[in-house]
Structure formats: C-alpha cells, structure tokens
C-alpha cells in the first residue's frame, strides 16, 4: 500500500491485488484490533481509492491469478506480500487437535471482530492456553486469549530472559536486547524463559491435554537441557508463535525470481536497480524481500521501491528516497 500510494501520486495507474476478502494483508488479519483498530486501514484505503488506486480482493496468485498474465498486462509488478511461512515445532504430538499456529488463531479472531461467523473458530474460552514463542505475535496470542476468557495462559520462550535494560555501549545499531512487557502480558500471563517443549500429550481422543517441557541453559550459543528439569503442564490449547521462516515460496517460484539464502526474493536496496528482482519488470519489497520484520520497515521499503519503479518506468523520478 505504501508503494501503491507513492506511485499513484506521480501519475501511474495502480492496481493492488489482495488474496483475502478485505484489503490490508497482515495489518488487517495479523494484528489484533485491541492493538490496532482497522478503521485506520479503512481510512487509508478510502483515501487511496480517491487517488485512483484500484483494489481487487480475493486475488490469489497461483490459483485465480497467473504471474505471466500480470507480467504481460502491466509495466511493472511489485511483490509485497508478508512473511507467512511459520516456523513449526516438529515434536511428538504436533498433529493433535488443539495445537495451532498463531496465524491460524489470530486472523480468525480478527475476522470475527469484523462480523464474520465461523463454525469451527479456535477459542481459548475456559482453556489452559500455552503460547510457545516470546515475541510480538506471542504477545498478541496472550491478549486475545485473555479476551476469550482463558482459564490460564502460559508463555514459553526458548531463549534466556533478557536483562531489564539494554547495554547502551553494545546496542546500536542493533535492536536493543532488554526485557519487554506488553499490555497483553500485564493483563495476565505466566511467562518463562529457557524452556524447550519436548512433546504434546494425547488425551486419548486425539486432542492435546498437556505438554512435556524442560529447562535449558545456553553455553557458547548452544542449548543444553538441564538434567532433572523436565515438567508437565496442562494445555488444552497450544499456540505456536515462534516467528516466520520466509514468505510463501509458491509465489516466488511462480514468478521464477532468484532467492537469497533465507528464501526471500533477492533484491538489492541500493544502486540503479534497487528492489529489482532477477525477473525483468518484477520488484520486491518489505517482508517479501527482507523476511519477517516490522510494519515500519515494510512502509519504508515500499516507498523506496516506488521510487525505483518510477525511475524504471520513466527514466527519472521525483519521488523521495
């Protein structure tokens, strides 16, 4: 959307394709309403429509949209999808009912808030919830579970507990390593660090009833289980929120673009062909190019990519970098 608006403002005809039934991607379906109300997305979409941007929903590349058709019909194509390939936890019991990816849980809740109805909605009501993963997505699972009325909520993180404040001499230019407590955590949650989940236990009917985990310690960047630290924890609902590996590979493969070592679309951010992929006329920005990251990075890269596309099409550009 950031790239689309910039390009529309310098006179290009822009079409935005969205695979879901509403515009907004991960902003709409990945972030809970208590964290970001969707009125902000709706307002921006309306603004962009008045600037002549065309939005099309239910457009799924590889299903009802062919990459070759896009390349032939348009002068440039920007791949700007989110990093949606979640990191899995391949341990015994992973297949049990009640063990879900966070991104199977959160989007459903957002759709319900928007007025949709589902027969098989994943609910945390009166359940003992365990969230595996200590990042922002895990925090969103905690907040959503609290709003469902969970019986208990525990959140596990594999890495050690960070310090209360960062080391100022070592932080820049990296993301400061320090303890972070969100409003979701403050609403109620038991948090623990250096925890490795070993298996999920079947209740005899194909549903998870508890998990088995242990404490670990880290030495020289390697994880070691602490002998005698194994424990069991009741769990009716387990949410896997351990980050994302890369964008969905299907789209990148269909466009036949070169990838980097992490499975993202390979494209430089500097030089004459910045944000251009190995495929002529095809550009990539945001999570599709850099992997899992923050909304602000997606906006920045979208705006920079728009400049590169404008220069590619017109031979020059007045868009800011």
Label the predicted regions:
Residues 79-80, 101, 131, 240:
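Redox-cofactor binding/interface segments in oxidoreductases and associated redox assembly factors
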Residues 1, 133-135, 287:
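Glycine-rich Rossmann-fold phosphate-binding loop(s) that bind the pyrophosphate
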Residues 124-135:
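Beta1/beta-strand and adjacent pyrophosphate-binding region of the FAD-binding site
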Residues 95-126, 219-292:
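FAD-site-proximal beta/loop scaffold in flavoenzymes
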Residues 1-61, 87-94, 104, 138-185, ...:
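Beta1-alpha1 glycine-rich phosphate/pyrophosphate-binding loop at the start
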Residues 42-92, 198-213, 217, 234-239, ...:
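Feature captures the FAD/FMN-dependent oxidoreductase FAD-binding
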């Amino acid at each position: 959307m950031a790239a689309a608006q910039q390009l529309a403002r310098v006179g290009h005809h822009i079409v935005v394709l969205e695979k879901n039934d509403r515009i907004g991607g991960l902003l709409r379906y990945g972030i809970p309403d208590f964290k970001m109300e969707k009125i902000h997305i709706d307002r921006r979409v309306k603004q962009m429509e008045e600037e002549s941007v065309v939005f099309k929903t239910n457009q799924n590349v590889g299903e009802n949209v062919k990459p070759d058709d896009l390349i032939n019909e348009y002068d440039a194509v920007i791949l700007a999808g989110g990093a949606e390939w979640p990191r899995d936890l391949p341990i015994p019991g992973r297949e049990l009912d009640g063990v879900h990816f966070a991104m199977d849980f959160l989007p459903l809740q957002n759709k319900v808030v928007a007025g949709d109805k589902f027969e098989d909605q994943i609910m945390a009501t009166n359940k003992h919830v365990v969230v595996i993963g200590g990042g922002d997505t895990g925090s969103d699972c905690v907040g959503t579970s609290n709003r469902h009325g969970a019986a208990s909520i525990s959140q596990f993180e594999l890495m050690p507990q960070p310090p209360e404040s960062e080391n100022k001499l070592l932080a820049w230019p990296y993301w400061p390593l320090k303890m972070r407590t969100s409003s979701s955590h403050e609403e109620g949650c038991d948090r623990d660090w250096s925890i490795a989940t070993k298996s999920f236990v079947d209740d005899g009917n194909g549903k998870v009833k508890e998990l088995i985990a242990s404490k670990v310690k880290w030495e020289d960047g390697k994880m070691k289980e602490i002998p005698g630290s194994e424990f069991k924890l009741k769990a009716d609902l387990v949410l896997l929120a351990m980050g994302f590996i890369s964008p969905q590979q299907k789209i990148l493969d269909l466009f036949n673009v070169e990838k980097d070592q992490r499975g993202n679309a390979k494209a430089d951010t500097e030089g004459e062909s910045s944000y251009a992929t190995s495929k002529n006329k095809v550009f990539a920005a945001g999570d599709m190019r850099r992997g899992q990251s923050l909304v602000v990075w997606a906006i920045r890269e979208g705006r920079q990519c728009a400049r590169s596309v404008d220069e590619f099409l017109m031979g020059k550009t007045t868009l800011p970098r």
